[in-house]
Amino acid sequence: MTKKICIAIDGPAAAGKSTVAKIVAKKLRFVYIDTGAMYRAVTYIALKNNIAYEDEKAIATLLQKTVIRFEPGEVQQVFVGEENVTEVIRSLEVTNHVSIVAAHPSIREALQERQQVFATEGGIVMDGRDIGTAVLPNAELKIFLLASVEERAERRYKENMAKGFAGDLGQLKKEIEERDHLDYTRTHSPLKKADDAIEVDTTSMSIDEVANKILSLAELKINN
């Protein structure tokens, strides 16, 4: 029987976390938990209810009454209550404001509690900004993905084009730099590499190369 370890994958925006995490989870037959989608879902409910992104108290109150859940599929489906928000949470409006919402301490605490519940049985791959440091500090395997700003902007540009979103590469680079600043400097659970995390620079690596590296590391932990 496969040992049910927890794998934490952290890193900045567009470093390839979600794509790699999905591949690793599928290969290991683990459950994938997209914590970024949870923060995007909260940002979306603020947008939908005309709540200012800076209004932490109002968003936290709304979140208490909101169920965020995942359903498996070829593309994992994200629901807010009964509404399928899988596509809308990837909109430019949500993308450009999620770091503001994610910086609110009460929002992070509420979502971290939910994320920890998901992980109680093990056998999960969870990606985000503070998984190895705050959400799953005892995860058996912690990965910290990096890539240059230029490479990440190029990846996000291609993603947007594939989804039919018009985009400006220079503007995307600027937005990623701004998100990095917010993520690294926020007071509550900033983005940082856990002391026991393994750093992987993905700038010159393909998605499969990154996934295979993590799978090799995971197999060592599973078989240890």
Swiss-Prot record:
Keyword Nucleotide-binding set for record: yes
Swiss-Prot/TrEMBL keywords: ATP-binding, Cytoplasm, Kinase, Nucleotide-binding, Transferase
Any one Gene Ontology cellular component term annotated for this protein: cytosol
CDD domains assigned to the protein according to its UniProt record, in alphabetical order: CMPK
InterPro entries cross-referenced by the UniProt entry: Cytidylate_kin (IPR003136), Cytidylate_kinase_dom (IPR011994), P-loop_NTPase (IPR027417)
Cell compartments where the protein resides: Cytoplasm
GO molecular function: ATP binding; CMP kinase activity; dCMP kinase activity
Domain of life: Bacteria
Reaction catalyzed: CMP + ATP = CDP + ADP; dCMP + ATP = dCDP + ADP
SUPFAM superfamilies: P-loop containing nucleoside triphosphate hydrolases
Binding positions for ATP per the UniProt entry: 11-19
UniProt-listed Enzyme Commission number(s): 2.7.4.25
Keyword Kinase: yes
PANTHER family found in the cross-reference section: CYTIDYLATE KINASE, CYTIDYLATE KINASE/PANTOATE-BETA-ALANINE LIGASE
Protein family per UniProt: Belongs to the cytidylate kinase family. Type 1 subfamily.
Protein name as catalogued: Cytidylate kinase
Organism of derivation: Listeria monocytogenes serotype 4b (strain CLIP80459)
